[in-house]
Amino acid sequence: MTAPAHEAQSPHQDLHESTGVESRKLAMWAFLSSEFLFFGALITNYLLYSGREFAAGPKPSEIYDIPFTSVSSFVLLMSSLTMVLAHNALSRGDQGATRTWLLATAMLGSVFLAGQVFEFTEFITLENMTLATNPSASAFYVLTGFHGTHVAIGVIMLLSLFGLSKRMDGLTDRQFLNLELVGLYWHFVDIIWIVIFTVVYLLTAAPGAS
């Protein structure tokens, strides 16, 4: 189904008086800002422990599978592209393409999550590195697990939009804002992972890093 393209400003949007920005979008930006600070604290916490030596068990940086995690990171990065394509499709009123790209984004996010579950399983069963092995392992699992939870929430939101579009034969002007908010959230999750992958995986696993 193809519907008229959405205009830049929907009449249903509730603008914040002082900023001229839609109130729900402003709230999302505020939420993401607080999450950015929280992730920053978790990354800092991991870095504080990553350079220390512990008697018990391996440190995460000693057992990373960088090629595998690189593929997972690429998959998540591509999901940002499909999210943009979903937004653009709805902007021009192409409801069918919107559903296709929403589903593609959710599937790519699910593949990333499956990769993370596989990585955790390998670390626990083969490398005997659990949450309680040492502070470095604990910091790693908390950081990456917290990010994985955000990805899972994003996948649920994407599938909800996909299901709503199927049930109503398209997304309305009001729901266009919902897609924009989900898009903001999803891009944030992707950017945070790029930071985590670079700082936590690549830099700490580099020769001489710890």
Residue ranges of predicted features:
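...captures the hydrophobic TM-helix bundle architecture rather than a specific catalytic motif
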Residues: 1-210
